[in-house]
Amino acid sequence: MLLDGDLLRHLKHLEVERRLAARTLANYQEAFKRLQVFAESAGVALREVQPHHIRRWAGQLHFKGLAPGSIAIELSAWRGFYRWLGRDGHVVLNPVAGVRAPKAPKPLPKALAVDQAVLLADQFDHADSPLLEARDHCMTELLYGCGLRVSELLSLDAQASTQAAGWIDAQDASAHVLGKGSKRRSVPVGGAALRALAAWMEVRGELATTGEAALFVSNRGTRLTPSQVRSRLKLRAIKAGLPTHVHPHMLRHSFASHLLQSSGDLRAVQELLGHASITTTQVYTKLDFGHLSKVYDAAHPRAKLKPPLE
């Protein structure tokens, strides 16, 4: 189709003065063709287009299945055209100025299948250092079995104290963590994680430097960093033969997904993840810890393993 004179002159401006690449110019030309078709179908001249026209046309593009990102590019091209017309005094109002593309849907969090998560947790590398294997096994169990954020995991201290941001109480099978916004919460710890914790605590002293409070320490004996956890978990997933890139937050997603699938209790899962309004003086808003423990024990696949014997 033959483009309107204004559109042709604007394309020339983009080519000569803005020096846009040929491929970019071709994309702009397609966007302008659609703008002209919309205007002709509405019986309105390009210089007389109003914001309600643009909103309707953007809606039609969305209805036809054009991705929000592509619609945003389309609107950007149209917006630039009307800005250019405005500089020459041909239009008073830029009809695209206040129009935004539909928001792109947030991607669903990726979670492992139950059998993949269990395989990852149960992975044992005989070639690895027994100390590192015990540590990594414990970290994996807590990330998946408790749904901890990596920051919460690494803030755990080996012993409870007034200075500790987080700790695990093996006696009442709970992890006490400081989450986002300095909000404390308690999360039940299942039998598999307690067994892994006991095994790690037996050898932790061989790595930790004197006086180091951190539950999880590096080869240097100091508190682990998030990047070190990501690296070790990635390696563990590769050795387990998992076909996907695994990171700590994926285990948190897996925790939530598997628990919700089994229990259907959205409110309990929300509390366990720390997504509710939890303050430092009130751990839970509406659900008591006993109810959360019951939901966890009945639904989470790693909670059903027996804890270590004294």
Task: Tell where the protein language model's regions lie, with residue ranges.
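Conserved catalytic core of the tyrosine transesterase superfamily
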Residues: 1-310
